[in-house]
A protein has these predicted regions:
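Short, small-residue alpha-helix embedded
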Residues: 19-22, 142-143, 201-225
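Conserved N-terminal subdomain of the carbohydrate kinase-like
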Residues: 3-6, 26-109
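Charged C-terminal helix
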Residues: 52, 226-265
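Phosphate-handling active-site elements
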Residues: 29-33, 192, 218-232
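Conserved phosphate/ATP/ADP-binding segment of small-molecule kinases
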Residues: 117-191
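N-terminal basic/disordered segments at the start of proteins
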Residues: 14-30
Length: 265
């Protein structure tokens, strides 16, 4: 069985973060492991508190994982401090990790920045050059490129700039401000659009975590990047179309929509 590791924050409501990542990885047929960057107290209406991991206690589980069940792919989500970013980069290089998917969680749904400037600098300096693919949304792509994105042409310019600057593929997600379901993959000097059907579901908590984890899962299984993105988009469309309705705010998707059998009844 192929394996995947998520390095991200914990969401107490289970809709995003490592909980969404591990459900997604399991649903996509790989064995899921985790290293926690932060504990959060949150639900579908918002985040009330965050307790960040220490650099030492992030490094320890990474050592434990890489020296025992080596991951075939790694997904990196929310990492809020420069010190933690440095530890992650050191461990990934030490163990020669492959198929690294970076979801640069930098901007909250409200538009507020989630990373301090030194953490953004560390992310760009330490992690982005290690990535096989980076999955920014529009606000994150604007921060990384220094550009304002208002249309598909702007997405292409920003993705090209980021890809060339950091030497990685970039999947620029069009759900913010530009369109709802079309994403752009830029790599090796060329762009490819992945068109998706808009699903009218207000419960979208954890979509970014889910997409990046699904991509990592498919890379772990040996699919190339184009196939991994295509399969990940199909999976997230199914999770949204299942129309799970939980909580009083923007609720989670049904990550296990395809799960059937005696134990689900």
């Amino acid at each position: 069985m192929k394996t995947a590791l998520t390095i991200a924050g914990s969401d107490s409501s289970g809709g995003a973060g490592i909980q969404a990542d591990m459900k997604t990885m399991t649903a996509n047929g790989v064995y899921a492991m985790s290293a926690v960057t932060a504990l959060t107290a949150q639900n579908t209406t918002g985040v009330t508190d965050i307790l960040e991991s220490t650099p030492h206690f992030l490094g320890e589980p990474l050592d434990a994982i890489f020296t025992d069940i080596f991951p075939d792919a790694v997904k990196i989500g929310m990492v809020s401090s420069a010190d933690l970013i440095v530890v992650i980069a050191e461990k990934l290089k030490q163990y020669k990790a492959e198929n690294i998917v970076v979801d640069p969680v930098m901007v909250a749904t409200s538009g507020a920045k989630l990373l301090r400037d030194d953490a953004v600098e560390a992310l760009c300096r330490e992690l982005l050059p290690l990535a096989a693919v980076l999955t920014p949304n529009i606000p994150e792509a604007e921060i990384l490129s220094g550009m304002t994105i208002t249309d598909a042409t702007g997405m292409e310019a920003a993705a090209k700039y980021i890809s060339e600057k950091y030497g990685c593929a970039v999947l620029c997600k069009g759900g913010h401000k530009v369109n709802d379901a079309d994403d752009l993959l830029w790599r090796n000097g060329f762009g490819k659009w992945f068109h998706g059907k808009r699903i009218d579901n207000p419960n979208t908590h954890g979509t970014g975590c889910t997409l990046s984890s699904a991509i990592a899962s498919n890379l772990a299984k040996g699919y190339d990047l184009d196939e991994s993105v295509e399969r990940a988009k199909e999976y997230i469309s199914g999770a949204l179309a299942a129309m799970l309705d939980l909580g009083h705010g923007s609720g989670p998707m049904n990550h296990m929509f395809a799960l059937k059998g005696a134990f689900t009844e």
